[in-house]
A protein has these predicted regions:
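Extended, histidine- and acidic-residue-enriched regions that form the cofactor-binding/catalytic faces
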Residues: 1-71, 75-170
Length: 170
């Protein structure tokens, strides 16, 4: 749940910091577009158009209840093109716009990643230094550092992760 957990925590913390208007943080959509991960056991993916439609219907529902500023905060790079397509679809077919960001591209998060990164050089990676650091801070019981190695499917060096880096990023 690394992608979901990191993204959801950042969304919740950001919402708590906003006083100017009400902010609704929906429960995360835990699956997305990941056909490139299917060779790795345990991966689950939606079809491209299924995921576009799921996101579209969530946005349409939220918009119907009066929320006019809709932000999709993403925690998985593979979802980025799908979110872009959904945003285009919303504008063309539903007549309203939304925003979509990867949490690691938010200015304060990106800046902190660059500062703390040893092996990743500011790159979020996949189960590498940054995601390992975030999980060590958020859910340390799920991280087994004694087996954290650079293996196929991992982009970045997880052994350089630590909870202090994760806390700074969050």
């Amino acid at each position: 749940n690394t992608d979901t957990n990191c993204c959801f925590t950042i969304a919740q913390r950001a919402a708590q910091a906003i006083d100017e208007f009400p902010v609704l943080v929906l429960p995360p959509i835990w699956t997305g577009y990941s056909p490139h991960h299917m060779p790795h056991p345990g991966s689950i993916t939606l079809k491209y158009h299924t995921f576009v439609e799921l996101l579209t219907q969530v946005a349409v529902s939220v918009h119907a209840h009066g929320f006019k500023k809709i932000l999709f905060l993403n925690g998985h790079a593979g979802n980025s093109p799908v979110i872009a397509a959904m945003r285009t679809k919303l504008a063309a077919e539903e007549g309203f716009s939304s925003l979509g960001y990867n949490y690691w591209d938010l200015p304060s998060v990106a800046e902190e990643i660059k500062k703390v990164s040893v092996s990743a050089k500011g790159f979020i990676g996949h189960s590498g230094e940054i995601e390992t650091s975030l999980q060590l801070y958020l859910q340390p019981e799920l991280v087994l550092m004694d087996v954290a190695t650079w293996v196929p499917g991992v982009w970045g060096n997880p052994s350089t992760g630590n909870p202090e880096k994760g806390e700074r990023i969050i």
